[in-house]
Amino acid sequence: MCSLQRKRAKYIFRLDDIAENMDWGNFFLLKELFIKHNVKPIIGVIPNNEDQELLLFPKCPFDFWEEIRSLQRLGWSIALHGFSHKYVTRNSGIFGINKKSEFAGLPYDLQNEKVQKGKLIFEQKRLKIDAFMAPAHSLDHTTLKALVDNEIKTITDGFCLYPY
C-alpha cells in the first residue's frame, strides 16, 4: 500500500547588497511584505561598502547598524556579503558564474584578512553572522579555508534550483 503525504514546500528568500547606500525604498517594501507574512530571509550585508554603483545611492538617513540589529531581532539571518564588495580579480571561482570576484584568485592571507575585518565590524556592531554570501557568486577553495578558519561554516548562494 502506498501512502502519499502532502509536504509543505520550504523556501529561502535571500537579499544581497545590503549597505548604507542602496535603494532603501525597495528594501522597505520587501521588509513590510516579509514581516506581514512572517518570512525570515537571509540578508547579505556589506560591512565596508566600496561598491561604486551602490555608492551612487544616498546614504540612509537612519542608523544603518541599528536597522540591521532590529532585523536580526526579528529572526532574519545575517550573512557576511564580502568585505568591500569591490571586485579585484577576473576569477569566477568554484561556480564559474561571473568573471569577477572580491575573493576568488587571491592568496589566503588577503582573503583571510577580508573575512577577519568583516567579521570584526559585525562584532563591533553587536551582530552575529550566520553565513557567508560571496559577492558575484564567486569564491574559491581558499575562501572556504578562510571562512572555516574564522568559524564561518555556512555559505549561501542563490543560483540553483537544487542544493549543491
Q: What is each of the regions a protein language model found here?
A:
Residues 1-131, 138-164:
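Catalytic alpha-helical scaffold of carbohydrate-active enzymes acting on polysaccharides/glycoconjugates
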